[in-house]
Amino acid sequence: MTQKEAINELKSEDSIHPRRLLELSKRIHGNSAKKQIAVDMLERYTGHDIKKFQKQIILTNFHFYVEQFNEAFDDSYHTKGSAFQASSSKKAKVTIVEFGVGSAMAALIGELISVVHPKAVLFLGLCGAVHRSLKVGDFILPIAAIRAEGVSNHFLPAQVPALPTFKVQKFVSQILVEHNYDYRTGTIHSTDFRFWEFDHRFKDNLIDERVLAVEMECAALFTTCFVSKVNIGALLLVSDCPMQKDGIKTKKSASEVFRKYTSLHIELGIQAMQEIATRGEKIRHYTW
Protein backbone atom coordinates (compact mmCIF):
# COMPACT_ATOMS: atom_id res chain seq x y z
CA MET A 1 0.00 0.00 0.00
CA THR A 2 1.38 3.42 -0.96
CA GLN A 3 1.50 6.36 1.42
CA LYS A 4 -1.33 8.08 -0.47
CA GLU A 5 -3.51 4.97 -0.29
CA ALA A 6 -2.81 4.61 3.44
CA ILE A 7 -3.78 8.23 4.10
CA ASN A 8 -6.96 7.92 2.03
CA GLU A 9 -7.91 4.76 3.91
CA LEU A 10 -7.46 6.50 7.25
CA LYS A 11 -9.50 9.50 6.07
CA SER A 12 -12.38 7.19 5.22
CA GLU A 13 -12.45 5.81 8.79
CA ASP A 14 -13.67 7.52 11.96
CA SER A 15 -12.09 10.52 13.66
CA ILE A 16 -9.73 8.67 16.03
CA HIS A 17 -6.96 8.65 13.42
CA PRO A 18 -5.78 12.30 13.02
CA ARG A 19 -2.66 11.52 15.04
CA ARG A 20 -1.84 8.62 12.73
CA LEU A 21 -2.30 10.94 9.73
CA LEU A 22 0.11 13.41 11.31
CA GLU A 23 2.67 10.65 11.92
CA LEU A 24 2.49 9.55 8.28
CA SER A 25 3.07 13.11 7.12
CA LYS A 26 6.00 13.78 9.48
CA ARG A 27 8.20 10.73 9.04
CA ILE A 28 10.74 10.96 6.26
CA HIS A 29 10.51 7.27 5.41
CA GLY A 30 6.75 7.66 4.82
CA ASN A 31 6.71 11.04 3.11
CA SER A 32 8.30 11.30 -0.34
CA ALA A 33 8.05 15.10 -0.49
CA LYS A 34 9.80 15.48 2.86
CA LYS A 35 12.44 12.96 1.84
CA GLN A 36 13.26 14.94 -1.31
CA ILE A 37 13.69 18.13 0.73
CA ALA A 38 15.79 16.24 3.31
CA VAL A 39 18.18 14.91 0.65
CA ASP A 40 18.58 18.42 -0.73
CA MET A 41 19.14 19.84 2.76
CA LEU A 42 21.66 17.17 3.76
CA GLU A 43 23.72 17.83 0.62
CA ARG A 44 23.45 21.59 1.08
CA TYR A 45 24.33 21.60 4.78
CA THR A 46 27.27 19.16 4.45
CA GLY A 47 28.46 19.95 0.92
CA HIS A 48 28.47 16.16 0.49
CA ASP A 49 26.95 14.34 -2.47
CA ILE A 50 24.38 11.85 -1.15
CA LYS A 51 26.11 9.08 -3.11
CA LYS A 52 29.36 9.68 -1.20
CA PHE A 53 27.83 8.82 2.18
CA GLN A 54 28.85 5.45 3.57
CA LYS A 55 26.47 3.11 5.41
CA GLN A 56 28.32 3.53 8.73
CA ILE A 57 28.14 7.09 10.03
CA ILE A 58 29.85 8.83 12.94
CA LEU A 59 28.30 12.02 14.33
CA THR A 60 30.33 14.59 16.25
CA ASN A 61 30.05 18.14 17.60
CA PHE A 62 33.64 19.15 16.88
CA HIS A 63 35.77 19.79 13.78
CA PHE A 64 38.81 18.24 15.52
CA TYR A 65 37.21 14.82 15.10
CA VAL A 66 36.80 15.38 11.37
CA GLU A 67 40.44 16.44 11.12
CA GLN A 68 41.52 13.26 12.91
CA PHE A 69 39.38 11.20 10.55
CA ASN A 70 40.97 12.87 7.51
CA GLU A 71 44.44 12.13 8.84
CA ALA A 72 43.54 8.47 9.38
CA PHE A 73 42.40 7.80 5.79
CA ASP A 74 44.23 8.91 2.65
CA ASP A 75 41.09 8.48 0.54
CA SER A 76 38.92 10.78 2.67
CA TYR A 77 36.45 12.92 0.71
CA HIS A 78 36.06 16.07 2.84
CA THR A 79 33.49 18.82 2.29
CA LYS A 80 32.13 21.87 4.10
CA GLY A 81 28.56 22.93 3.53
CA SER A 82 26.50 25.88 4.70
CA ALA A 83 26.09 24.49 8.24
CA PHE A 84 28.00 21.21 8.72
CA GLN A 85 31.10 19.45 7.44
CA ALA A 86 31.54 15.82 6.47
CA SER A 87 34.20 13.38 5.39
CA SER A 88 33.84 9.91 3.85
CA SER A 89 36.26 7.04 3.32
CA LYS A 90 35.31 4.23 0.95
CA LYS A 91 38.27 2.28 2.29
CA ALA A 92 36.91 2.45 5.85
CA LYS A 93 33.26 2.37 4.74
CA VAL A 94 32.62 5.19 7.21
CA THR A 95 31.38 8.79 6.98
CA ILE A 96 31.81 11.36 9.76
CA VAL A 97 29.57 14.43 10.10
CA GLU A 98 30.11 17.43 12.37
CA PHE A 99 26.63 18.86 12.98
CA GLY A 100 27.09 21.49 15.67
CA VAL A 101 25.93 21.57 19.29
CA GLY A 102 22.55 21.17 20.98
CA SER A 103 19.33 19.22 20.75
CA ALA A 104 17.79 21.13 17.84
CA MET A 105 20.76 20.38 15.59
CA ALA A 106 20.84 16.80 16.88
CA ALA A 107 17.19 16.26 15.95
CA LEU A 108 17.83 17.78 12.54
CA ILE A 109 20.79 15.54 11.69
CA GLY A 110 18.92 12.53 13.10
CA GLU A 111 16.18 13.05 10.54
CA LEU A 112 18.43 14.08 7.66
CA ILE A 113 20.79 11.13 8.00
CA SER A 114 17.88 8.71 7.61
CA VAL A 115 17.77 9.40 3.86
CA VAL A 116 21.15 7.67 3.55
CA HIS A 117 19.62 4.46 5.01
CA PRO A 118 22.70 3.83 7.17
CA LYS A 119 23.38 0.44 8.67
CA ALA A 120 24.51 2.09 11.90
CA VAL A 121 25.18 5.55 13.35
CA LEU A 122 27.45 6.33 16.30
CA PHE A 123 27.47 9.62 18.18
CA LEU A 124 30.83 10.54 19.72
CA GLY A 125 29.94 13.20 22.26
CA LEU A 126 31.34 14.93 25.33
CA CYS A 127 29.55 15.03 28.67
CA GLY A 128 29.84 16.48 32.15
CA ALA A 129 30.13 13.98 34.99
CA VAL A 130 27.48 13.90 37.70
CA HIS A 131 28.47 10.77 39.60
CA ARG A 132 31.41 11.31 41.94
CA SER A 133 33.22 8.17 40.70
CA LEU A 134 33.69 9.58 37.19
CA LYS A 135 36.74 11.53 36.10
CA VAL A 136 37.86 13.37 32.97
CA GLY A 137 38.78 10.90 30.24
CA ASP A 138 36.30 8.19 31.29
CA PHE A 139 34.00 6.60 28.71
CA ILE A 140 30.24 6.19 29.11
CA LEU A 141 28.00 3.92 27.04
CA PRO A 142 24.53 5.33 27.80
CA ILE A 143 21.65 2.88 28.09
CA ALA A 144 19.05 5.67 28.13
CA ALA A 145 18.73 9.44 28.07
CA ILE A 146 16.32 11.57 30.10
CA ARG A 147 14.38 13.70 27.63
CA ALA A 148 14.73 17.15 29.20
CA GLU A 149 15.87 18.90 26.00
CA GLY A 150 12.39 19.62 24.64
CA VAL A 151 12.75 18.94 20.92
CA SER A 152 12.12 15.19 21.21
CA ASN A 153 8.53 15.96 22.26
CA HIS A 154 7.81 16.81 18.63
CA PHE A 155 8.48 13.18 17.69
CA LEU A 156 7.17 10.94 20.49
CA PRO A 157 4.95 11.28 23.58
CA ALA A 158 6.79 12.40 26.71
CA GLN A 159 6.43 9.01 28.43
CA VAL A 160 8.42 7.16 25.73
CA PRO A 161 12.06 6.62 26.81
CA ALA A 162 14.98 7.73 24.65
CA LEU A 163 17.04 4.60 24.04
CA PRO A 164 20.01 3.79 21.82
CA THR A 165 20.02 0.71 19.59
CA PHE A 166 21.29 -2.14 21.77
CA LYS A 167 23.29 -3.89 19.05
CA VAL A 168 25.25 -0.76 18.17
CA GLN A 169 26.14 -0.32 21.85
CA LYS A 170 27.11 -3.99 21.95
CA PHE A 171 29.61 -3.55 19.10
CA VAL A 172 31.14 -0.50 20.80
CA SER A 173 31.41 -2.31 24.14
CA GLN A 174 33.19 -5.21 22.45
CA ILE A 175 35.78 -2.83 20.98
CA LEU A 176 36.35 -1.26 24.41
CA VAL A 177 36.74 -4.65 26.10
CA GLU A 178 39.12 -5.95 23.41
CA HIS A 179 41.37 -2.93 24.01
CA ASN A 180 41.12 -3.24 27.81
CA TYR A 181 39.37 0.11 28.29
CA ASP A 182 37.00 0.50 31.21
CA TYR A 183 33.64 2.13 30.63
CA ARG A 184 30.46 2.90 32.54
CA THR A 185 26.87 2.27 31.54
CA GLY A 186 23.81 4.05 32.86
CA THR A 187 21.34 6.85 32.27
CA ILE A 188 22.36 10.32 31.17
CA HIS A 189 20.45 13.59 31.30
CA SER A 190 19.99 15.50 28.02
CA THR A 191 19.28 19.19 28.53
CA ASP A 192 18.86 22.38 26.51
CA PHE A 193 20.08 24.43 29.50
CA ARG A 194 23.69 25.36 28.77
CA PHE A 195 24.65 27.05 32.04
CA TRP A 196 23.00 24.52 34.32
CA GLU A 197 26.18 24.35 36.41
CA PHE A 198 25.14 27.56 38.20
CA ASP A 199 21.59 26.43 39.03
CA HIS A 200 21.57 24.57 42.36
CA ARG A 201 18.00 23.31 41.92
CA PHE A 202 18.96 21.77 38.59
CA LYS A 203 21.99 20.09 40.14
CA ASP A 204 19.90 18.72 43.03
CA ASN A 205 17.50 17.26 40.48
CA LEU A 206 20.37 15.47 38.73
CA ILE A 207 21.25 13.76 42.00
CA ASP A 208 17.61 12.71 42.48
CA GLU A 209 17.56 11.25 38.95
CA ARG A 210 20.65 9.10 39.65
CA VAL A 211 22.15 9.99 36.26
CA LEU A 212 25.80 9.43 35.42
CA ALA A 213 26.34 12.54 33.34
CA VAL A 214 24.80 15.51 31.52
CA GLU A 215 24.97 16.41 27.84
CA MET A 216 22.78 18.05 25.19
CA GLU A 217 22.22 15.75 22.23
CA CYS A 218 21.58 12.07 23.05
CA ALA A 219 17.86 12.21 23.84
CA ALA A 220 17.12 14.07 20.60
CA LEU A 221 19.33 11.74 18.56
CA PHE A 222 17.94 8.55 20.08
CA THR A 223 14.33 9.71 19.63
CA THR A 224 14.55 11.07 16.09
CA CYS A 225 16.61 8.13 14.90
CA PHE A 226 14.13 5.68 16.40
CA VAL A 227 11.23 7.42 14.66
CA SER A 228 13.24 7.60 11.42
CA LYS A 229 14.22 3.90 11.66
CA VAL A 230 17.94 4.59 12.08
CA ASN A 231 20.11 2.36 14.27
CA ILE A 232 22.09 4.60 16.60
CA GLY A 233 24.49 4.27 19.51
CA ALA A 234 26.63 6.68 21.50
CA LEU A 235 30.03 6.65 23.14
CA LEU A 236 30.49 9.61 25.45
CA LEU A 237 33.74 11.01 26.80
CA VAL A 238 33.72 12.76 30.17
CA SER A 239 35.20 16.20 29.49
CA ASP A 240 34.62 17.88 32.86
CA CYS A 241 33.22 17.32 36.37
CA PRO A 242 30.92 20.32 36.97
CA MET A 243 29.50 18.96 40.25
CA GLN A 244 32.93 19.30 41.85
CA LYS A 245 34.59 22.53 42.97
CA ASP A 246 36.48 24.13 40.06
CA GLY A 247 35.34 21.23 37.88
CA ILE A 248 33.64 23.25 35.12
CA LYS A 249 35.35 23.04 31.75
CA THR A 250 37.41 26.07 30.72
CA LYS A 251 39.27 27.01 27.56
CA LYS A 252 42.47 25.62 29.04
CA SER A 253 41.00 22.35 30.33
CA ALA A 254 39.07 21.81 27.09
CA SER A 255 42.28 21.99 25.08
CA GLU A 256 43.78 19.40 27.45
CA VAL A 257 40.83 17.07 26.84
CA PHE A 258 41.22 17.36 23.08
CA ARG A 259 44.97 16.82 23.33
CA LYS A 260 44.84 13.80 25.65
CA TYR A 261 41.65 11.89 24.95
CA THR A 262 39.80 12.68 21.75
CA SER A 263 42.21 10.87 19.41
CA LEU A 264 41.42 7.64 21.26
CA HIS A 265 37.71 8.51 21.24
CA ILE A 266 37.56 8.84 17.45
CA GLU A 267 39.81 5.80 16.96
CA LEU A 268 37.45 3.61 18.99
CA GLY A 269 34.44 4.99 17.13
CA ILE A 270 35.98 4.26 13.75
CA GLN A 271 36.90 0.72 14.78
CA ALA A 272 33.37 0.05 16.02
CA MET A 273 31.84 1.27 12.75
CA GLN A 274 34.34 -0.73 10.68
CA GLU A 275 33.48 -3.81 12.73
CA ILE A 276 29.80 -3.32 11.94
CA ALA A 277 30.62 -2.79 8.25
CA THR A 278 32.67 -5.98 7.88
CA ARG A 279 30.33 -8.30 9.74
CA GLY A 280 27.38 -9.70 7.86
CA GLU A 281 25.22 -9.57 10.98
CA LYS A 282 22.10 -7.50 10.42
CA ILE A 283 21.04 -4.89 12.93
CA ARG A 284 17.27 -5.17 13.09
CA HIS A 285 15.16 -2.13 13.83
CA TYR A 286 11.87 -2.37 15.67
CA THR A 287 8.95 -1.82 13.30
CA TRP A 288 5.41 -0.80 14.13
Residue ranges and their predicted role:
Residues M1-L122, G128-W288:
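Accessory terminal and edge-of-domain segments that mediate assembly/interaction
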